[in-house]
Amino acid sequence: MGGTDEIPANSEFSAAEVLGKYLRRPSLFLPLLGLTTLVLYSGSLFFDFVWDDWPQIVNNPIVRSWSNLPRAFGSDLWYHMARHQVYYRPLFVAWSMLNYALFDLQPWGWHFAALLAHVATVAAVFWLARRLGLEYWTAALAALSFALHPIHIEPVVWISAASDTMVTMFVALAFVAFLNGRDPLRTNKTAWRSLSLLLLACALLTKEMAVTFAALVAIYAWMRPLHGRNSQRRAVGAILEAIPYGLVTIAYMLLRKHALVHATGQFDPSHGVIDVIRTLPLVVSVYLQKLLVPVGLTGLYYTPYVTGAIFRQLVVPALVLGMVVAGLWYWNRQEGDSTIAFAGLWMLVGLAPALYLRNFGNGDFVRDRYVYLPSIGFAILLAMGCRRLPSIKGWSAQAVQASAVVLLCMAYVTASLAQQVYWASDLLVWRRGQALYPGNPYAEVGLSAEYSERGAHDRAIALAQKAVREHPEYAYGPLALAESYIRAGRFDEGRVWLQKIDPAYVKSEIGMATFAGLYGRMGDFDKALALCSEILTKEPNLYSALYNCGNIHFMNHQFGDAERLLSRAVELAPEQAAPKHFLGRALLEDGRNEEGQPYLRQAAALDSKVWDYHYWLGVSFEESGNMPQARAEYQQALKLNQDSTEAKIKLTALEGK
């Protein structure tokens, strides 16, 4: 691989020449790279929904109907859960609606859609690199490294992180359109500029990471001015070119503010600016480390605020970052190529929204998905560096560069395949995080909940106790311990820990709904229903509260109240199976089987994989005298849950009828 676009005429590399001749065509190179990427991540098609996929996708009524699209533009991503969230991503919700229409709740389809988004972004990176002035093979190498880099595992194989993939695709395309719009050789510059603004709007409506786009435009315009090179004219020109993008960003922020009228402020007000400044070098250095050596990847890094070990956690990272900046400055000055400086600034500016640490919980500052957009700059620098590798005795520069690329690809593919599996299930996600960062209370609490749901109560309690003991300041520790005790049937201990939970959490919508559910599980219906009354007084149309409180009334045999709340939940989310199922059961238990059976039918049709939906539909059929249908539903329930004693008993009883 040489430093020009031409294929070297060297008979020793005849095979490489033939291959290079064909790959020199983007129409062949990009599909081949896309296919390679699909194969690399094909294992994710067998992964389940994990982590935030459950509330954002599986249990989100909004994504189940296109009629909810206007609501997506007027509310936050978690509107159905609470009213004080800060995630405004309507285009991601629209993408989720499309996936639901195409794949229902089949995880493979959602994973395939997320993988296609990554492949599309890879193509956008190639196009961007070319428009930035990189020659063909350097741009191809940038796209290749971006496609295969293991740090992209999280946004590719975790469905909920596809918003990062999508926003990056839109940003890259918007910048390409911006570059085309300022190209003096093009005649349709106005159309390109308009397209650039439209693509920026799409990026902003996908995820907040695009808010720095105007800054990238200004930086590029200053580095490569259209008119004049004196500092004042360059600055004015850069500002003028960035103004339209700034106006689009301001319009987005106003729209976001209107939609998130109930959003709360900063997440962690207990740490000030000094804490943030001391911690930033460590956070940025961790990102740089993972880009350079992508091992030990997880969705649950733990980098708490720097309060001690100043030399190791502040001075050393700051010195390392200083050396990196100095190295890039020297490289840029030696070659006189502003692309080097711009790629470095792309990394920093692209990461900037994720560096406002007070938006996150203590220690939750590093996430691989946040570096997906900034890593375009890294891929460009890596490609430029590889293309400048010199000859070594006995090896031409082309041979050295080709060997380096092969070794890099082998390392990336190996590291990626070895670490993708940790996103296959919730249990693997939490176990990986807790194994790599055993001091992370968030990972301990999450793994505790996972163990508890699987019936490993002793393990769950031990992990929750560890989190409470080692991190008494962590607000969710007592809640996790209380839930673990309650799930284990140790209600007295559960009640003790419920009293130790942060009062601020208890007063929130999610907190009240959680407490109501836990009290209902223990049979403390008076306390549970009092909380239900309080939350529904504040938010009478909150789906999660209507559904949870309707179930509590059902468990307390208050079927009339259960019918009232669950009917409202069904009205708000007609595509959800669960509220219809429990509404049908409430009517069945209340002696109104004829009214309840249609709801039970609809629930089993909407979500045919839930065994007890079929079981209770069978009970309804049996009560109405339809024995063949009852038998069929009991058999389906037993097929889905072979350990169902209830279904076995019902089938045995029907044999004599």
Predicted regions: what is each one?
Residues 453, 487, 521, 555-556, ...:
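Register position in tetratricopeptide repeats
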Residues 435, 468-469, 500-503, 534-537, ...:
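Conserved structural position within tetratricopeptide repeats
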Residues 2-492, 497, 507-510, 514, ...:
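Polytopic membrane enzymes that build or remodel cell-surface glycoconjugates and lipids
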